[in-house]
């Protein structure tokens, strides 16, 4: 029993005394003083500088977060409409001007009419391509499949006339301008090939008609070249090689 009592006294034995309680209180007071001193130091830190209200108003963001300020001019449909209206037409961007095409056609159809050099100096291949296709189509309707001859003679003839004009003129001329003028002047030959659909041109009438058409084409081409390149007094020198070129087209058309 004595051992059991000693065990109980050992089990419930504690070193806690009043002195320890006072020491704990002193420690808590020290902690409180330490916390208070830290709080006082935090309150004594320097405050940020004063910023005027005008500066805040000028640099502040007028919109809201996640909601940008709307721009009525940017999102208005009228701005898109105005941008489309200011764009040039598609035909003008492609270089197709029906007014100039019609003026060049009238210049070719009337050899006595003076040519406008500013218009004829343009590189317009819309009319020449149409006239070449029309010549091939009329020859096809007349029973002559000569598309290869038409395109081949056109390309070789343009190269020859281009080289000749660059040697004769001081300003020089582009290949596109030569092809444009020779292509437009092919229109009378289209008229001759259209006549070959309805009656035969192998005879005196056909020969005379072919000579008239050759002179018509070469006269129109030489007139346009002299006007566009300022080659006054050299029209006959230019008309001779043009007559040789259009004579080949006449041979294909008649025979």
UniProtKB/Swiss-Prot annotation:
It is a multi-pass membrane protein. GO terms for biological process: endoplasmic reticulum to Golgi vesicle-mediated transport; vesicle fusion with Golgi apparatus. InterPro entries: Yip1/4-like, Yip1_dom. One of its GO terms (cellular component) is cis-Golgi network. Residues 1-124, 168-180, 226-234 are cytoplasmic. It is found in: Endoplasmic reticulum membrane; Golgi apparatus, cis-Golgi network membrane; Golgi apparatus, trans-Golgi network membrane. Pfam families: Yip1 (PF04893). Its main location: endoplasmic reticulum. It comes from the Eukaryota. Residues 146, 202-204 are lumenal. The chain crosses the membrane at residues 125-145, 147-167, 181-201, 205-225, 235-255. Keywords: Endoplasmic reticulum, Golgi apparatus, Membrane, Transmembrane, Transmembrane helix. Belongs to the YIP1 family. PANTHER family: GOLGI MEMBRANE PROTEIN YIP1, PROTEIN YIPF7. This is Protein YIPF7. It comes from Bos taurus (Bovine).
């Amino acid at each position: 029993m004595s051992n059991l009592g000693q065990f109980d006294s050992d089990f419930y034995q504690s070193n806690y005394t009043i002195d320890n309680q006072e020491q704990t209180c002193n420690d808590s007071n020290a902690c409180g003083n330490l916390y208070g001193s830290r709080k006082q130091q935090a309150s004594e830190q320097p405050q940020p500088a004063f910023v005027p209200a005008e500066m805040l108003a000028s640099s502040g963001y007028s919109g809201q977060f996640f909601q940008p300020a709307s721009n009525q001019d940017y999102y208005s449909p009228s701005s898109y409409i105005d941008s489309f209206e200011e764009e040039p037409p598609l035909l003008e961007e492609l270089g197709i001007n029906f007014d100039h095409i019609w003026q060049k056609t009238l210049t070719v159809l009337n050899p006595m009419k003076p040519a406008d050099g500013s218009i004829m100096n343009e590189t317009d291949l819309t009319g020449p391509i149409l006239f070449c296709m029309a010549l091939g189509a009329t020859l096809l309707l007349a029973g002559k499949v000569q598309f290869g001859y038409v395109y081949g003679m056109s390309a070789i003839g343009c190269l020859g006339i281009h080289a000749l004009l660059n040697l004769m003129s001081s300003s020089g001329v582009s290949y596109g301008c030569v092809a444009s003028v020779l292509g437009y002047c092919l229109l009378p030959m289209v008229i001759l090939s259209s006549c070959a659909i309805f009656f035969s041109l192998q005879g005196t009438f056909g020969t005379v008609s072919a000579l008239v058409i050759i002179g018509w084409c070469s006269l129109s081409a030489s007139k346009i070249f002299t006007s566009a390149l300022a080659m006054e007094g050299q029209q006959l020198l230019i008309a001779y090689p043009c007559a040789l070129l259009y004579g080949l087209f006449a041979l294909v058309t008649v025979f």
